[in-house]
């Protein structure tokens, strides 16, 4: 029977002949149905030929026994083929084949056949993923290709290789049963008077057997005719795999029938004689190297082919990408300013620097990201922040030296590499971090001597961005507002504290620099008042005689003189005196408010350049030495940032302190009411700046401490009654009912 014929397997070079299919135990009950079917088929047909066919051949034709004989032989042949033929058993995986897939393999794999997802299940017995339409027979204990069902009447599984014979067996058996029953009925009709005879009794017995088997066989035949026409198997029909969808294996009725009856025989996977493989073992006893074709692709768990080997360069690139935690820099901005014209002689160096793409400094990966008490902001790269720091001269950082006075000194510092991008070549001791050199400024005498040079060098180099430029670029990035649309935006805290966006400032800037057109500059920049507006307001408020000349020598005036190419430069002594006065005045304010710390009521989020210890606003910044100093020290204490990271807000603070010093000499305490007028007059209405007819002084600077819970007010209590030790809060209502509370 089929048990002996199906015990073959795949034989290795030194393995037993059939190791893949284990020998099944002999169970007599398995052979009962097939034995009964064989007995009824052969016995009834033999009786029919012995007792009925001779009379039929004599009375009607010799073709009757010939027809029945051919049909019986066809039935018997198909029965034997369906019983003894291999249905398409897949050999089981050997141990060395499935050891890498058995434990980590998922339960299912999904493949796509004609656009339809078909699931392949993992067979734990055979240890491989069963192909589509394959199933494991529980009786035969084998995975059968195109499994239809296990037929007990033939004692074999019906699969791809023997389904044709099983189907033909059903068809021929049905026809044979009908022929036997019909010809037997014909014999009885002619011998109704002789029913007691042996021939009539045997013929009626054969008719009873044929009639008994005709109903189930005819029903099974009709069922399989439908399955063949629809291109399905019994297993698919019973389990209902394609009951509510489309069968991807059907090719139409005619093609399905022709595929079952006329297709070529499927190959057999068991019992193949394989040649012995000779493997040459090398001296280190290593496995032979696999070829590229063997390593080309492997079907992954989801059915997708993936490459198993990667080149060395791709692995190194993946390792470098995983090791580098710094995000990639944004695309380089095209630094073009509409309507910006530079002088042909004095501005060639700055124009070339503006056209260069801002580099991403190495210090960025060592600087911590900023955090806010209530918000989480995206980290800002220096490539984006440098865009706002490379603004035109009349909006860039202030400098204490003029074009003529500092030109040679700055060019000498650039040649010797004294800028932030090179080593300190001007005789200033410094330190190096991340490939960049930074001066340390431990001598107080060097501090005052190098202050003006630092501002000019810093404004012309591609240094890391300052605090003010980082603040403005951070705000523009956080608001996601382009520079053109920012002019028409809603009321913001920047417009309240930045009077530089008013029409007066836009019109006054070209007057101070006649070489530039009147086109307003696009984008945010450091909020500074022009020197001319400051001079007019100071004259209207206090009419000082001495302070006007002092204000014209202020650092902000020096910036506009540099931008317009004007020759007047404050002398060295006057500049040192202004530095000394502003520092002493700021020391007075700083120590006066030292014991009145309170949490900021309205402050901007800390930036990348704000991380570290709290920094009072000074005209320049040096490296921190963490040493205490007397309140009346002629030089300010060093701070926790290098020279290249000094901010424009510090220069703005110096400029306002010089203004306050001159205002305190001339006018006294009338500045606070004007501050409130100025604060409200430069607010925006419907996105447009609204100038005020009343001239006012600059706003009080609000210096925000980076320590949580502390804020230092930089305005002294002697300047205005609004700046008392207890402090106060200004409330400004904007468009849409938004109320801004500003700590002063």
Swiss-Prot record:
Origin, by domain of life?
Answer: Eukaryota
Keywords, in A-Z order: Acyltransferase, Cell membrane, Lipoprotein, Membrane, Methylation, Palmitate, Phosphoprotein, Transferase, Transmembrane, Transmembrane helix
Compositionally biased intervals (Basic and acidic residues): 398-413, 571-584
Q: What is its EC number?
A: 2.3.1.225
Give the Cytoplasmic membrane side ranges. Answer: 1-30, 83-167, 230-744
Instruction: Tell me, in a sentence or two, what this protein's role is.
Output: Palmitoyltransferase that catalyzes the addition of palmitate onto various protein substrates and is involved in a variety of cellular processes.
Its recorded name reads Palmitoyltransferase ZDHHC5-A
Q: Which organism is it from?
A: Danio rerio (Zebrafish)
């Amino acid at each position: 029977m089929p048990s002996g014929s199906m015990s073959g397997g795949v034989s290795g070079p030194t393995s037993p002949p059939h190791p893949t299919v284990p020998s099944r135990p002999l169970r007599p009950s398995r052979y009962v149905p097939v034995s009964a079917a064989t007995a009824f088929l052969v016995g009834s047909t033999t009786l029919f030929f012995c007792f009925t066919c001779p009379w039929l051949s004599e009375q009607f034709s010799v073709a009757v026994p010939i027809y029945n004989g051919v049909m019986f032989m066809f039935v018997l042949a198909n029965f034997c083929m369906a019983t003894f033929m291999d249905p398409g058993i897949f050999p089981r995986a050997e141990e060395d084949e499935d050891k890498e897939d058995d434990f980590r393999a998922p339960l299912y794999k999904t493949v796509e056949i004609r656009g339809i997802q078909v699931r392949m299940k993992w067979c734990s017995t055979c240890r491989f993923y069963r192909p589509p339409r394959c199933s494991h027979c529980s009786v035969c204990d084998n995975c059968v290709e195109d499994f239809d069902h296990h037929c007990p009447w033939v004692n074999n599984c019906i699969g791809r290789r023997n389904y044709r014979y099983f189907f033909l067996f059903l068809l021929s058996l049905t026809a044979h049963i009908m022929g036997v029953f019909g010809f037997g009925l014909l014999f009885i009709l002619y011998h109704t008077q002789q029913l007691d005879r042996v021939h009539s009794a045997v013929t009626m017995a054969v008719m009873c057997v044929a009639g008994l088997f005709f109903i189930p066989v005819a029903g099974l035949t009709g069922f399989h005719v439908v399955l063949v026409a629809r291109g399905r198997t019994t297993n698919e029909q019973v389990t209902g795999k394609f009951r509510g969808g489309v069968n991807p294996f059907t090719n139409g009725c005619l093609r399905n029938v022709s595929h079952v009856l006329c297709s070529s025989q499927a190959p057999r996977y068991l019992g193949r004689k394989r040649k012995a493989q000779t493997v040459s073992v090398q001296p280190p006893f290593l496995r032979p190297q696999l070829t590229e074709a063997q390593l080309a692709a492997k079907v992954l768990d989801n059915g997708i082919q993936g490459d198993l080997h990667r080149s060395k360069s791709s692995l190194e690139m993946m390792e470098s990408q995983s090791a580098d935690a710094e995000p990639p820099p944004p695309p380089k901005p095209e630094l073009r300013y509409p309507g910006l014209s530079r002088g042909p002689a004095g501005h060639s160096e700055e124009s070339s620097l503006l056209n260069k793409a801002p580099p991403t400094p190495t210090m960025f990966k060592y600087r911590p990201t900023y955090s806010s008490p209530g918000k989480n902001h995206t980290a800002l790269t220096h490539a984006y922040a440098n865009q706002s720091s490379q603004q035109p001269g009349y909006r860039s950082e202030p400098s204490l030296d003029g074009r003529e006075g500092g030109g040679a000194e700055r060019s000498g510092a650039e040649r010797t590499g004294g800028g932030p991008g090179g080593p300190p070549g001007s005789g200033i001791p410094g330190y190096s971090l991340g490939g960049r050199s930074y001066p340390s400024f431990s001598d107080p005498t060097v501090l005052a001597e190098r202050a003006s040079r630092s501002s000019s060098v810093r404004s012309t180099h591609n240094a890391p961005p300052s605090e003010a430029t980082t603040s403005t670029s951070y705000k523009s990035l956080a608001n996601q507002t382009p520079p053109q649309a920012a002019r028409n935006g809603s009321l913001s805290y920047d417009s309240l504290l930045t009077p530089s966006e008013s029409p007066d400032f836009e019109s006054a800037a070209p007057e101070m620099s006649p070489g530039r057109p009147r086109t307003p500059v696009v984008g945010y920049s450091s909020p500074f008042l022009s020197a001319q507006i400051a001079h007019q307001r100071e004259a209207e408020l206090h009419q000082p005689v001495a302070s006007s000349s002092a204000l014209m020598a202020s650092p902000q005036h020096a910036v506009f003189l540099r931008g317009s190419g004007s020759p007047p430069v404050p002398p060295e002594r006057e500049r040192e005196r202004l530095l000394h006065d502003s520092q002493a005045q700021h020391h007075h304010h700083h120590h006066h408010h030292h014991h009145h710390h309170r949490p900021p009521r309205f402050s901007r989020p800390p930036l990348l350049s704000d991380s570290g210890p709290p920094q009072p606003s000074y005209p320049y910044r040096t490296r921190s030495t963490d040493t205490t100093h007397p309140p009346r020290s002629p030089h300010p204490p060093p701070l926790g940032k290098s020279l290249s990271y000094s901010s424009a807000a510090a220069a703005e603070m110096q400029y306002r302190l010089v203004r306050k010093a001159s205002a305190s000499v001339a006018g006294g305490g009338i500045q606070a009411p004007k501050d409130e007028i100025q604060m409200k007059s430069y607010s925006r209405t419907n996105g447009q700046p609204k100038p005020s007819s009343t001239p006012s002084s600059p706003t009080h600077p609000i210096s925000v401490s980076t320590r949580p819970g502390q804020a230092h007010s930089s305005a002294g209590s002697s300047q205005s009654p609004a700046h008392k030790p207890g402090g106060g809060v200004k409330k400004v209502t904007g468009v849409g009912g938004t109320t801004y509370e500003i700590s002063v």
